[in-house]
């Protein structure tokens, strides 16, 4: 009896390590709740492109019968704004009325040819106007109280007369293809009653979002005081201060599309693979249009995929970037994960033809915690011809229809053929908690 009891005790104690091992294995394979958050952390800018211009000859001035050109990209609804000094004046400048020179007809056809009819002469309001001409003394007499900017239409506040801007300056647009234009300024004032040189100047193109320009008055505003270095152009022909200011307003603005989040195990990243063409399972729709629903539905049928979510931002659907003091959009999702699970995400670079952000390689270890923004890359889906991001007539989110191409998926270089992007971690942030 004692022997039997002793054997039973040993059997019980001998089973304890096996029981503990079994419990440990069970604990390791138990589901764990984690939370993923994706944020648009881009400190956005309102201008997609800008620049300065001057004559390339011995003098930076554009004299009568001289011309210069500069190139830019633009989508339908965007406009070209520029300013330069009416040289033989005290504080007058040339500029189109805001928001700028129209670049596309309402049907989307690029506008070409003479657009001089959109040019005007403006008074900066900081100097008393003398009779325009070679004898104007600079800087002249300051206004006792600076006035607001106003159009000079025939005569100025002192009664001096002026020919129409369109007879002094000729503006010509040429469409170069793929949303790119060349604008040429020609000084045609030589044979008029108001001959004048033109100074170096500044030009700008505003982003457009939801049909509205982010900055419809980038260089000046009629009826408002001059600002940001415009006086230096209007009085002295010095474009450096306004050029520097506008450069600081120029950069990247892009929303992110509703985010695709996938949990998978035992397979490679199921969303994409660099070096191969789009698989035709819905990634093209995500990359071109920001629509991840088709890809999510397909992935739910793939062996090894445990869950697929499409996360729209509350109220806005898309994840907007930071705009001034307004925080960027974000989305979150609780996930049930276990040992060996991986997480992959994808979201469209909204103002592109077919670029998308996605986890690189084989995704993220689902049981880790922290900031995984460094695990995100920017990729070209290879299904649409690229244009300047945020200024492409065929970009879907700018009311365009993408132009088809067929190339392997590849990382977007930075700098790229169009612009220099911020670091990816300065655009999208991914956190697991």
Model segments located where?
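Bacterial N-terminal signal peptides that target proteins for export
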Residues: 2-11
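Short, ordered beta-strand-loop transition motifs
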Residues: 11, 175-178
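Mature, soluble, non-transmembrane domains
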Residues: 65-68, 73-81, 85-176, 191, ...
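Structured domain cores in non-transmembrane regions
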Residues: 30-112, 178-180, 189-357
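Beta-rich interaction/scaffold domains
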Residues: 1-2, 16
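Compositionally biased regions
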Residues: 5-6, 241, 340, 376
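Bacterial Sec-dependent N-terminal signal peptides
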Residues: 15, 19-35
């Amino acid at each position: 009896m004692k022997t039997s009891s002793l054997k039973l005790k040993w059997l019980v104690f001998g089973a304890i390590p096996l029981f503990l091992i079994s419990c440990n294995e069970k604990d390791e394979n138990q589901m764990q709740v984690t939370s993923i958050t994706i944020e648009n952390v881009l400190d956005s800018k309102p201008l997609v492109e800008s620049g300065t211009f001057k004559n390339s000859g011995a003098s930076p001035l554009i004299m009568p019968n001289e011309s210069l050109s500069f190139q830019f990209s633009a989508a339908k609804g965007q406009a070209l704004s520029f300013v330069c000094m009416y040289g033989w004046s005290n504080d007058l400048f040339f500029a189109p009325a805001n928001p700028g020179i129209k670049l596309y007809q309402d049907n989307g056809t690029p506008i070409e040819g003479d657009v001089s009819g959109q040019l005007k002469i403006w008074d900066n309001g900081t100097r008393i106007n003398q009779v325009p001409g070679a004898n104007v003394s600079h800087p002249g007499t300051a206004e006792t109280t600076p006035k607001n900017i106003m159009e000079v239409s025939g005569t100025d506040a002192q009664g001096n007369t002026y020919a129409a801007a369109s007879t002094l300056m000729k503006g010509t647009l040429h469409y170069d293809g793929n949303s790119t234009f060349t604008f040429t300024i020609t000084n045609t004032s030589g044979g008029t009653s108001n001959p004048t040189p033109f100074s170096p100047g500044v030009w700008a193109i505003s982003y457009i979002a939801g049909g509205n320009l982010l900055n419809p008055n980038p260089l000046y505003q009629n009826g408002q005081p001059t600002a940001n270095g415009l006086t230096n152009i209007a009085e002295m022909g010095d474009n450096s201060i306004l050029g520097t200011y506008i450069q600081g307003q120029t950069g990247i603005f892009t929303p992110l599309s509703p985010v695709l989040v996938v949990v998978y195990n035992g397979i490679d990243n199921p969303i994409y693979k660099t070096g191969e063409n789009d698989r035709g399972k819905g990634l093209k729709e995500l990359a071109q249009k920001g629509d991840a629903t088709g890809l999510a539905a397909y992935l739910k049928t793939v062996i090894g995929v445990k869950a697929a979510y499409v996360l729209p931002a509350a109220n806005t659907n898309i994840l907007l970037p930071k705009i001034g003091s307004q925080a960027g959009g974000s989305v979150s999702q609780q996930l049930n994960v276990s040992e060996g699970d991986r997480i992959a995400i994808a979201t469209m670079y909204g103002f592109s033809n077919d670029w998308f952000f996605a986890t690189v390689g084989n995704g993220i270890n689902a049981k880790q915690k922290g900031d995984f923004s460094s695990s995100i890359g920017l990729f070209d889906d290879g299904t649409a011809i690229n244009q300047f991001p945020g200024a492409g007539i065929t970009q879907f989110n700018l009311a365009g229809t993408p132009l088809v191409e067929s190339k392997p998926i590849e990382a977007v270089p930075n700098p790229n053929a169009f612009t220099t992007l911020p670091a990816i971690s300065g655009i999208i942030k991914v956190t697991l908690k």
